[in-house]
Amino acid sequence: IPVTGAVIVTTPQNVALMDAVKGIELFNKVQIPVMGVIENMSTHICSNCGHEEQIFGTGGGDLLSEQYDIPLLGRLPLNVQIRENADAGKPSVAAGDANAVNYMAIAEKIARALPKAEKDKSRIF
């Protein structure tokens, strides 16, 4: 299966952003288009009270998006419901939980970008 593009997934903290930058630069070097960035664990949502806070910092995905001129595809929270559903064999979208909308929005952005991506069927990496 030919590689059409890469999606960078990072957390907003600086140490993770350094790894994400290495990934972006590697994909650029081997001419694999970076289709966008996803900020994982963007916020923490307390399972008891619903309070939301940014325990890993803020703006990391935005920074990468601006610095490398790639779209910010979305943000995903650090939420116990995501793990519980995955452990039960039902990812958020299949379970229809509150996080499903975030995953669907990201998937739709990637799907819209795919036809625009240049395809090189001769390469697999």
Where do the PLM segments sit?
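Ligand-binding clefts of soluble mixed alpha/beta catalytic domains
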Residues: 7, 23, 28
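C-terminal lobe/tail of nucleotide-utilizing enzymes
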Residues: 26-125
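Inter-motif core of Ras-like GTPase G domains
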Residues: 1-15
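Active-site glycine- and acidic-residue-rich loops that bind
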Residues: 14-17, 54-55
